[in-house]
Amino acid sequence: MSTLRLLISDSYDPWFNLAVEECIFRQMPATQRVLFLWRNADTVVIGRAQNPWKECNTRRMEEDNVRLARRSSGGGAVFHDLGNTCFTFMAGKPEYDKTISTSIVLNALNALGVSAEASGRNDLVVKTAEGDRKVSGSAYRETKDRGFHHGTLLLNADLSRLANYLNPDKKKLAAKGITSVRSRVTNLTELLPGITHEQVCEAITKAFFAHYGERVEAEIISPDKTPDLPNFAETFARQSSWEWNFGQAPAFSHLLDERFSWGGVELHFDVEKGHITRAQVFTDSLNPAPLEALAGRLQGCLYRADMLQQECEALLVDFPDQEKELRELSTWIAGAVR
């Protein structure tokens, strides 16, 4: 019986694909070597310990229907669209070795006619007249008895959109998380015009088989039916939840300020695990009472636009004469924290 397993996803849903990856990783036998090939529609994927409000322009993402997905590995934020091919290599220990999976990807690129090399901790680069350009980035995860290496190859990604979503708003955002280094990147279509996702998947598959001297039939994972994987439904529910994607952010502070016709407002939030642990409001409004009441209501509130808006509007009962001000405040806050 083959020790290899090849899975190819037909889904473009990042939460679905990451849930598939997680389920396979948890239940695979330690003797198995797995290759999973997939891609995501418009998504920002962040590392396990990253702060989405720091790393991403979450407001623009919401406007453009770009999803946020937190992966279980470390590393930085990346933008995925259908111009990316994603790969995951998994193996039990002691056999797991990320240099093997890296060499498989390099061999696949070489077979396609691209000479690339490993650079730094987790990048693959090609040499161009303008200098080295990144075509692949990776991240890794290890447990006591297994490990995985996953990454992306830039085929024909919209690099201008990459900058749109990975450059955060210029907010006064003092985070305890770390901002990722942005790398200079290029698409493989610049070197191989017309290269497709299917061709890249085939090349990686051939290099995978060649390395291990075995072949195996591909298992197609379809979004049309629930994958036959242990605990998939629970894993997908967690992967797609606000609590996982946003609520796992490291502690941070956020300062919002705005001037309205009725006065200036400064809001100071301390946020931990997606909840406001401290809220302070400063204002030169002639009627500060509703704002002072708001600070009390926001303590413990989820740091989510709809929840903050709800707390603002709840004050209308106690402060009906300030309806105009409270509605303006509510609209501004909801937009500012997206």
Swiss-Prot record:
Protein's pathway: Protein modification; protein lipoylation via exogenous pathway; protein N(6)-(lipoyl)lysine from lipoate: step 1/2; Protein modification; protein lipoylation via exogenous pathway; protein N(6)-(lipoyl)lysine from lipoate: step 2/2
Annotated compartments: Cytoplasm
Residue span(s) of domain BPL/LPL catalytic: 29-216
Enzyme Commission number(s) from the entry: 6.3.1.20
Binding-site positions, ATP: R71, G76, A77, V78, F79, K134
GO molecular function: ATP binding; lipoate-protein ligase activity; lipoyltransferase activity
Superkingdom of the source species: Bacteria
Classification via NCBIfam families: lipoyltrans
Protein name: Lipoate-protein ligase A
Species this protein is from: Escherichia coli O9:H4 (strain HS)
